[in-house]
Amino acid sequence: MFDSVTVIGAGRAGSAIAARLRERGVRVGEEGELYLLCVPDRAIPDLAHGIPSGPWVAHVSGATPLTALAPHVRRFSVHPLQTLTMSRGAEQLDGAWAAVTGESPDALAHATALADILGLRPFVLADDRRALYHAGAAMASNFLVTLLRGAARLLADAGAPPEALVPLMERTIANDFELTGPIARGDTATVERHLAAIRSEEPALEPLYTALAEATRP
């Protein structure tokens, strides 16, 4: 549906997306049929205002509403539900889901077409549900880093290698997140020993452990 795309932004998302478009034979350059904003959320409105009317305009933000693309009416968004890095290329997009948002059937068709070109698995997301959706994505991805850092501190304090946590976390994912451990068993005595040890060695982590334990109880 798009033979040419102007990708604005050369960060993690923009670089991976531009590479994939080129792989699929789409011309990436100036005056494209689509202007795709791959920039920080706060920069989207000003950049959108500077784009001439006529072509489609879209962004790849997870939380930003389509009104940020005003005054354009031919607009949509495609948010790859994936964590992206500069050290890898277009293969990061393979098989990832993508939230597509549009205000008309035509806009959704164009958004879905772009997702397909990028190798993504699109699903339709209402514009007014974006913040809630993105909060869930942040919990699953960003807070996983927080959990690993906290767990690594506890292992290091105990004299155990923090890198030993990685296979454990990978297996949890491979096992479809089946809950195991003391909370799953209802072993409150072990949980209390955990809390006592954390309180002694890493008191700043006690509120985090307590909140997670409460949220994890079956």
Each language-model region and where it sits:
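NAD(P)-dependent Rossmann-like dehydrogenase/reductase catalytic/cofactor-binding core
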Residues: 163-218
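Hydrophobic Val/Ile/Leu positions in short beta-strands of Rossmann-like dinucleotide-binding domains
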Residues: 5-7, 37, 100
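Rossmann-like NAD(P)(H) cofactor-binding subdomain of soluble oxidoreductases
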Residues: 15, 19, 32-90
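Internal alpha-helical scaffold of NAD(P)-dependent oxidoreductase catalytic cores
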Residues: 90-174
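Phosphate-coordination loops involved in phosphoryl transfer and adenosine-cofactor binding
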Residues: 2-4, 54, 95
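Hydrophobic beta-strand scaffold residues
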Residues: 25-28, 75, 122
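NAD(P)+-binding Rossmann beta1-loop-alpha1 motif at the extreme N-terminus of oxidoreductases
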Residues: 1-31
